[in-house]
């Protein structure tokens, strides 16, 4: 890449890593009607994506609960692709605040609420104890929280504490690029113990009256 300005030329040489596999999530039976639960189908695509591969989600509205990324993979949301959060909180897994070790001394932080390691629902997109993950494209993560009960009495714990839109914990080399994240259940992007996190050219859209969606 070369840039010329004020008589000077600046040059940057770089090499992008090769994409090993292109995984079309539509082949896993996605139903783009905005109503059918696609959680298992989408997770199957993410979980079976080989190292260095990209999971491609075409345009459409895909209802889903929590999804979990794996290391060395990319999630590409095509323009017009919307991952639409499930409105039923009982469809979301609950993550323990901490996991104790066998020696009963060490603990592993998994999630929390307002600074405390408390059991919470898993987010719409979870990046947990992984590395080299990219989420990119012009698509949207829409938690659709306004159409559930997530914003009703938000300080009251119901089953577990509210999830995040994107929850990243104990991970490294994470990039969110180009996407839109909106209508979050609570905090929108929540990184904890994350090294080398890039947030590039992406949008956050939450209504002014949405509680704690900063």
List the predicted regions and their residue ranges:
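Extracellular/periplasmic carbohydrate-active domains that bind, remodel
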Residues: 1-214
């Amino acid at each position: 890449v070369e840039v010329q300005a004020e008589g000077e030329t600046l040059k940057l040489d770089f090499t992008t890593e090769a994409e090993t596999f292109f995984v079309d999530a539509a082949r896993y039976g996605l139903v783009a009607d905005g109503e059918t639960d696609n959680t298992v189908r989408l997770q199957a695509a993410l979980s079976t994506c080989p190292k260095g591969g990209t999971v491609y989600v075409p345009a459409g509205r895909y209802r889903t609960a929590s999804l979990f990324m794996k290391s060395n993979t990319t999630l590409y949301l095509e323009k017009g692709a919307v991952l639409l959060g499930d409105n039923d909180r009982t469809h979301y897994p609950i993550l323990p605040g901490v996991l104790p070790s066998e020696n009963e001394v060490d603990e592993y932080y998994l999630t929390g609420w307002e600074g405390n390691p408390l059991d919470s629902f898993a987010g719409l997109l979870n990046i947990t104890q992984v590395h080299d993950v990219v989420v990119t494209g012009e698509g949207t993560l829409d938690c659709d929280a306004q159409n559930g009960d997530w914003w009703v009495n938000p300080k009251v714990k119901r089953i577990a504490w509210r999830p995040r839109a994107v929850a990243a914990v104990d991970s490294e080399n994470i990039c969110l690029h180009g996407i839109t994240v909106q209508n979050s259940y609570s905090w929108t992007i929540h990184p904890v113990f994350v090294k080398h996190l890039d947030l590039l050219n992406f949008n956050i859209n939450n209504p002014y009256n949405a509680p704690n969606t900063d």
